[in-house]
């Protein structure tokens, strides 16, 4: 697939090294996922787990950022999304390194014996409320099929002692998620609050937890500068992926 033909495809998102089709996925490629995939710490990792893989975006970003020896498991409950993730991965340079599993993570995790150095998730965060257009979108948006305590428990069952569990959430929900994680024995090690520009309050938060205690590093990321162009910090974080950066 050449860049000249793929850049104009309307059913997905073209990155520098791969294309993500998402027309059969409830949740499309967006800034949240791109932020998380570019931000999650990958130094020294040997095995990664993507919980709720959707289109396969995070798994593909991690594959681009890591050595050829790193293996990635991507677990997705919804069959159409999992099938599209598999197609996206098959067309990428890293098909041999990413395994897609169509499964409920709560059941899948009980069958695993390996431990992961990095567990990553762009999780649902809405409580049950206004109906979505499709059951698939409701599943992707609401915590009914995977609530936050269950997500934290799943990650705890399969992570290495020095590993990181990374999520992206709305700011206020992220604060509650952090309190819950700490009460369950996790340690917050990295936190980046994300604002659209300097004048606005943070609207998203990137969080990295570990079973191992240690210093917590916190910072703030502004997506756009005063001229409305991408900020230097956001560009530095994501330029390996965005096509025209």
Swiss-Prot record:
SUPFAM superfamilies: S-adenosyl-L-methionine-dependent methyltransferases. Coiled coil: none annotated. It catalyses: adenosine(37) in tRNA1(Val) + S-adenosyl-L-methionine = N(6)-methyladenosine(37) in tRNA1(Val) + S-adenosyl-L-homocysteine + H(+). Keywords: Cytoplasm, Methyltransferase, S-adenosyl-L-methionine, Transferase, tRNA processing. Pfam families: MTS (PF05175). It is found in: Cytoplasm. InterPro entries: DNA_methylase_N6_adenine_CS, SAM-dependent_MTases_sf, Small_mtfrase_dom, tRNA_Adenine-N(6)_MTase, tRNA_adenine-N6_MeTrfase. Its EC number is 2.1.1.223. GO terms for biological process: methylation; tRNA processing. One of its GO terms (cellular component) is cytoplasm. The keyword Isomerase does not apply. Gene3D superfamilies: Vaccinia Virus protein VP39. CDD domains: AdoMet_MTases (cd02440). It is an enzyme of class 2 (transferase). GO terms for molecular function: nucleic acid binding; tRNA (adenine-N6)-methyltransferase activity. The keyword Amino-acid biosynthesis does not apply. HAMAP family: tRNA_methyltr_YfiC. Specifically methylates the adenine in position 37 of tRNA(1)(Val) (anticodon cmo5UAC). This is tRNA1(Val) (adenine(37)-N6)-methyltransferase. It comes from Escherichia coli O81 (strain ED1a). The lineage of its organism: Bacteria, Pseudomonadati, Pseudomonadota, Gammaproteobacteria, Enterobacterales. The gene is yfiC.
């Amino acid at each position: 697939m050449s860049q000249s033909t793929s850049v104009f495809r309307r059913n997905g998102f073209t990155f520098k090294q791969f294309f993500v089709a998402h027309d059969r996925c409830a949740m499309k490629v967006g800034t949240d996922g791109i932020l998380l995939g570019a931000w999650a710490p990958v130094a020294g990792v040997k095995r990664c787990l993507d919980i709720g893989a959707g289109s396969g975006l995070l798994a593909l970003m991690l594959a681009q950022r890591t050595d050829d020896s790193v293996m990635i498991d991507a677990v997705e409950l919804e069959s159409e999304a999992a099938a599209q993730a598999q197609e996206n991965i098959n067309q990428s340079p890293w098909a041999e390194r990413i395994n897609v599993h169509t499964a409920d993570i709560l059941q899948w995790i009980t069958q695993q014996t390996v431990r992961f150095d990095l567990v990553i998730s762009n999780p649902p965060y809405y409580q049950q409320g206004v109906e979505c257009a499709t059951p698939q979108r409701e599943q992707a948006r609401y915590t009914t099929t995977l609530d936050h305590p269950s997500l934290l428990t799943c990650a705890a069952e399969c992570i290495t002692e020095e590993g990181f569990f990374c999520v992206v959430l709305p700011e206020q929900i992220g604060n509650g998620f952090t309190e819950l994680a700490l009460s369950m024995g996790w340690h917050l090690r990295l936190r980046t609050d994300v604002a659209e520009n300097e004048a606005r309050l943070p609207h998203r938060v990137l969080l990295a937890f570990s079973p191992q205690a240690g210093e917590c590093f916190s910072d703030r990321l502004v997506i756009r500068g005063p001229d409305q162009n991408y900020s230097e910090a956001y560009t530095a974080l994501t330029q390996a992926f965005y096509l025209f950066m």
